[in-house]
Amino acid sequence: MTMITDSLAVVLQRRDWENPGVTQLNRLAAHPHFASWRNSEEARTDRPSQQLRSLNGEWRFAWFPAPEAVPESWLDCDLPDADTVVVPSNWQMHGYDAPIYTNVTYPITVNPPFVPAENPTGCYSLTFNIDECWLQKGQTRIIFDGVNSAFHLWCNGRWVGYGQDSRLPSEFDLSAFLRAGKNRLAVMVLRWSDGSYLEDQDMWRMSGIFRDVSLLHKPTTQISDFHVATRFNDDFSRAVLEAEVQMCGELRDELRVTVSLWQGETQVASGTTPFGGEIIDERGGYADRVTLRLNVENPALWSAEIPNLYRAVVELHTADGTLIEAEACDVGFREVRIENGLLLLNGKPVLIRGVNRHEHHPLHGQVMDEQTMVQDILLMKQNNFNAVRCSHYPNHPLWYTLCDRYGLYVVDEANIETHGMVPMNRLTDDPRWLPAMSERVTRMVQRDRNHPSVIIWSLGNESGHGANHDALYRWIKSVDPSRPVQYEGGGADTTATDIICPMYARVDEDQPFPAVPKWSIKKWLSLPGELRPLILCEYAHAMGNSLGGFAKYWQAFRQYPRLQGGFVWDWVDQSLIKYDENGNPWSAYGGDFGDTPNDRQFCMNGLVFADRTPHPALTEAKHQQQFFQFRLSGRTIEVTSEYLFRHSDNELLHWSVALDGKPLASGEMPLDVAPQDKQLIELPELPQPESTGQLWLTVHVVQPNATAWSEAGHISAWQQWRLAENLSVALPSAPHAIPQLTTSEMDFCIELGNKRWQFNRQSGFLSQMWIGDEKQLLTPLRDQFIRAPLDNDIGVSEATRIDPNAWVERWKAAGHYQAEVALLQCTADILADAVLITTAHAWQHQGKTLFISRKTYRIDGSGQMAITVDVEVASDTPHPARIGLTCQLAQVAERVNWLGLGPQENYPDRLTAACFDRWDLPLSDMYTPYVFPSENGLRCGTRELNYGPHQWRGDFQFNISRYSQQQLMETSHRHLLHAEEGTWLNIDGFHMGIGGDDSWSPSVSAEFQLSAGRYHYQLVWCQK
């Protein structure tokens, strides 16, 4: 044990937090979760241990701008003005200094290993009583599961130790410091340390004791470590459980270890052995270690699909059988290996349906509770995810247990990121930083290696490629050859990774960056000598209204076996709750706390909002990742299962046929598909519709029974096909009254019964409509070529740093947002049975014509207004965001009814999950509340839209809400939006895709850009 004076002054003088060679003082070695049961049955059933005591709760807290401001007296007694905070928590969430959101740029001046003199410091203290029997014998430890960034610990005024690495436990022996009765802990937490240079992840920078604190009482002679691993024969019919157990203490020669393996209430295998029997080399063996091997016949294998778990109980006892201590862990029999360029799980090539997940809570910052963790896992499973990357640090210990039990594959990632360094490997190639990096990798492995869910180790994130990575890669491969190692830094295919693991590589497009080219994922596989599998560590940047082009990745994954999936960036928006002057909550992002530097809304890249409400993009991910694929041939549906191990034992296939949303026939049958097999389902003779319309066959896979992660009735997969339809010929209708045209100097006015249409001759726009005396429009019907910019449209562009390549900057520079309209034509003609208004407009900026729009409005005797639009786009203007019409309707109706794709928001490059049907939703549900307002709520493939007294028919896309595109463009946060008068309607003949390969470069694929020179669309507007 390192001895140091208890004086605070000496601690401050040492400045351990500015020395990369000092990562800890007196911290105990890393190990798996301990509970120190004194009863084997309690260990087997994972009951709460009497030897484990939580110290979570209210602690005294005082904040100081720097450690030098902390008074020496605080070591012995609470300060009179100390506050109370809950542990675990981030002190920024309690009003002490501010959270900082930055992606790449360090939040402090870069001068490693030194940190600013103004280093916010939190002083925590807790007074507690200790169980006196704990003082009489044994060892009492204190465990801090997570403290950011570094801390010194005192107990009863005496210095205990020091720790850093905010995402792994720091554990200390308190035995020599405790006394009978009351005891006082004092923890001085520093916001910044040299460790902060290794923790430059894209997240909020927060501080404090943000994970659990607990006391653990162990016997003097104790289990100090244990490691389990599973080995198999070729066909997985026989397995061996290897358990390596290490002890410390006395009576070594008289001790025995028993390892028993349980499956529920049944003991499967057991073995007992003394210590020191295994020869390691010519000098002998470890006197304090032993390895037991238990044979298991026909083991129930673990996978994310079927997470079969056993329970291993490790008992330390005397030769006569007296139990000293028991530890235990869940065991999953599974094998991970790479063979012939494929990542195999239990001999099968696994397709990673993955997502990156930050530990984030909108109210609690980086504090994770079990309820939130379970909620995340259930949502992931329900949306067909099978894997999660712990981005970019080891997670709360409970997370891994839950992943074991519910079934998720885990990439466990070391808490190392130096993204803001120039070059990025400045520290990771420096041997002076190897000890700090080594602690972060080795301790992660030692803590988490018993978890079957952990199938891949990661050396960290965005830290370049340095010699330290190579050393740590070799260490892991030596200590744990049972798992592959991945690391993206330095080009995603260095010697420090077993898997090609690029981020944001595109399907077909090379990005030939200097030094670290990012090849298309298809090309990467074919590079000379490249035999590794490719799994994208990050892809499909889900920032705001995004995930366009996701289907293209999944087409490639299914086409090329060595393209084994990837991890979407990312799971949850990292917005935080603030409150306005009236106490109303609102969602904040970078800069909203006065934090500098900041990267604005770049913290919100989630498939779910911070409160775990799904984004519409989540449904697209669910559909593309579904485990059942379908093919229709005649009346036969071929169902292919992509499950590797699971037979479809809880699935019904429901099919239905509908004509323009009207059900014609349906049926249901059980699915009986073996893993990686097919089932042919013959449908009955389908009804022939008597009328015309779109005829669709829809299939859903429904789980009739509840599972551990879903309720009864959960839909896991679906598909639609458009069937052959009857052709129709428009027959002449019975004569109607002929609309009457009235011409004045200002207007053309058409009247039919109680309806009137007014066209302003000076503007050429439909300026008003009446039903009776009620006006229908608040603004004229106009062309629209813009959208409120998406995050993907903005990219990295900002007011002080313009990116001219961003879509929004191209549109601005070309004048799309500032275009003024010039009337070219506005005429009226009386036809035999209708009135025809013909208009032409030029949309211009600084004397240059960007668009010419020619329209005809044909109002017939039935009251229908048929609108035909032809648009010419200048060849040298950027491709527009949309080609459509917009107006502000006077009515605010409660519901919107449409025949088209839905029910969720969908866009041309993100619509495979949408289904064609007749949908009916509240108006409020047509708006997607992205925290940073943008274009939202589009519904594509629409044949009919009904709202209030109005109906629109044609083939178009639309969005409808209380917010104009102008307001969405000008508003920084969703809570600042105000419902405008009436309802804004946008009807598009054509709409550009949204992109999503990344959010900092134009990523809309060419096929989803509006690159043609001419566009034509039609629609009919009438009153119901």
UniProtKB/Swiss-Prot annotation:
The record marks H358, H392 as: Transition state stabilizer. The keyword Magnesium applies. The active site is at E462 (proton donor), E538 (nucleophile). GO terms for molecular function: beta-galactosidase activity; carbohydrate binding; magnesium ion binding. GO terms for biological process: lactose catabolic process. Mg(2+) 2 binds at N598. Substrate binds at N103, D202, E462, E538, Y539, A540, H541, N605, W1000. It comes from the Bacteria. Its cofactor is Mg(2+); Na(+). InterPro entries: B-gal_small/dom_5, Bact_Beta-galactosidase, Beta-gal/glucu_dom_sf, Gal_mutarotase_sf_dom, Galactose-bd-like_sf, GH-type_carb-bd, Glyco_hydro_2, Glyco_hydro_2_AS. SMART domains: Bgal_small_N (SM01038). Its EC number is 3.2.1.23. Mg(2+) 1 binds at E417, H419, E462. PANTHER family: BETA-GALACTOSIDASE (PTHR46323:SF2). Belongs to the glycosyl hydrolase 2 family. NCBIfam families: PRK09525.1. This is Beta-galactosidase. It comes from Escherichia coli (strain SMS-3-5 / SECEC). The gene is lacZ.
